[in-house]
């Protein structure tokens, strides 16, 4: 049975050393009830990341939104996260699946690489992500993933597909039409005057 959590807005936090501001931003955005929220931080300070992740995890639990950690299985386990999202350099997928157990979410970044998506599914991924779909301010040098990957993925893979990279309300519908079940978004929500309202607007795209 498909995981009903894996459809809708996949909100990703901006990278910020200012914990107070970040937590306040997340609290506002969660009012829009995204499907998932991912804590993503490239800060080198492990203590800062742990502190931020714990506070955001608590907000997600209160809001009833699954909390995912980017890049770090260790941090996901330390914060009792609902799942982890791993890229190419973030460890063995089979080991991550075993450590998480069957009830938590394992997501895999596949860039524009079809074989990696197939391997991720074989390792027990709950969803696979392709991107960047559009040019992205968050990762300007990211490879581009054509919408045809989503068309093929919907036809040939048994897990939901996440789209990431430059997604906005203006271009989201075509990505959903191609086959994406999750839209991973940072800037278009967190840069909005009302992040909660912006997040809620994405939800309506999936209700149509």
UniProtKB/Swiss-Prot annotation:
GO CC aspect terms: cytoplasm
UniProt name for this protein: Thiamine-phosphate synthase
* Cysteines joined through disulfide linkages: none
UniProt xrefs under SUPFAM superfamilies: Thiamin phosphate synthase
So where does Mg(2+) get bound?
71, 90
Name the coenzymes or cofactors required: Mg(2+)
Q: Which GO terms describe its molecular function?
A: magnesium ion binding; thiamine-phosphate diphosphorylase activity
Keyword entries, A-Z = Magnesium, Metal-binding, Thiamine biosynthesis, Transferase
Amino-acid positions noted as binding 4-amino-2-methyl-5-(diphosphooxymethyl)pyrimidine in the UniProt annotation, renumbered to this chain: 38-42, 70, 109, 139
The record's section on Gene3D superfamilies has: Aldolase class I (3.20.20.70)
Task: Give the enzyme's EC designation.
Answer: 2.5.1.3
Q: Could you say which protein family the record assigns here?
A: Belongs to the thiamine-phosphate synthase family.
**GO BP field:** thiamine biosynthetic process; thiamine diphosphate biosynthetic process
């Amino acid at each position: 049975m498909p995981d009903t959590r894996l459809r809708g807005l996949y909100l990703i936090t901006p990278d910020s050393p200012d914990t107070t501001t970040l937590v306040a931003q997340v609290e506002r955005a969660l009012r829009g009830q995204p499907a998932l929220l991912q804590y993503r931080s490239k800060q080198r300070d492990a203590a800062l990341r742990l502190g931020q992740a714990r506070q955001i995890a608590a907000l997600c639990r209160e809001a009833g939104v699954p909390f995912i950690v980017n890049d770090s299985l260790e941090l996901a386990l330390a914060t009792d996260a609902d799942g982890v999202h791993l890229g190419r350099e973030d460890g063995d997928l089979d080991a991550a699946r075993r450590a998480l157990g069957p009830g938590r979410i394992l997501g895999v970044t596949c860039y524009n690489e079809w074989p990696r998506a197939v391997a991720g599914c074989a390792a027990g991924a709950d969803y696979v992500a392709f991107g960047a779909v559009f040019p992205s301010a968050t990762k300007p040098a990211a490879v581009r993933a054509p919408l045809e990957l989503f068309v093929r993925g919907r036809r040939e893979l048994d897990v939901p597909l996440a789209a990431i990279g430059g997604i906005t309300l203006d271009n989201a519908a075509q990505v959903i039409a191609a086959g994406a079940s999750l839209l991973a978004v940072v800037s278009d929500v967190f840069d909005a005057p009302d992040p909660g309202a912006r997040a809620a607007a994405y939800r309506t795209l999936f209700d149509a």
